[in-house]
């Protein structure tokens, strides 16, 4: 039996070692033949907590890890530019912010 793989976008990373990945599938409508998009959300295991919202990832089917989690992150295809900015954000010091307000 072949290993199932999906490519999707991380839409939530608020859980420990778990992310929610949205996978979009496109198919023609059986009657009208218009291309229809359907989004399925999978909970996937992220051992290192390395994924952030907006990342493109490849997930593979694994053994059941919990009630809803049966997928694992195989690789991160691309990181979200928004996640890169937040990781290296340089927020102004509180003194500098107070100085700007007083001026």
Swiss-Prot record:
The keyword Kinase does not apply. One of its GO terms (biological process) is translation. Pfam families: Ribosomal_S17. It comes from the Bacteria. Residues 78-103 are annotated as: Disordered. InterPro entries: NA-bd_OB-fold, Ribosomal_uS17, Ribosomal_uS17_bact/chlr. GO terms for cellular component: cytosolic small ribosomal subunit. GO terms for molecular function: rRNA binding; structural constituent of ribosome. The keyword Ribosomal protein applies. Keywords: Ribonucleoprotein, Ribosomal protein, RNA-binding, rRNA-binding. One of the primary rRNA binding proteins, it binds specifically to the 5'-end of 16S ribosomal RNA. Belongs to the universal ribosomal protein uS17 family. Part of the 30S ribosomal subunit. This is Small ribosomal subunit protein uS17.
């Amino acid at each position: 039996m072949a290993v199932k793989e999906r490519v999707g976008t991380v839409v939530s990373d608020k859980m420990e070692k778990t992310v929610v990945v949205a996978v979009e599938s496109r198919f023609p409508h059986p009657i009208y033949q218009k291309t229809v998009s359907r989004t399925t959300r999978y909970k996937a295991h992220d051992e290192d907590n390395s994924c952030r919202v907006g990342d493109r990832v490849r997930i593979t089917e694994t053994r059941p890890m919990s009630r809803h989690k049966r997928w694992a992150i195989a690789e991160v295809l691309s990181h979200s530019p928004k996640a890169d900015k937040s990781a290296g954000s340089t927020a102004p010091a509180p003194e500098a912010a107070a100085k700007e307000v007083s001026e």
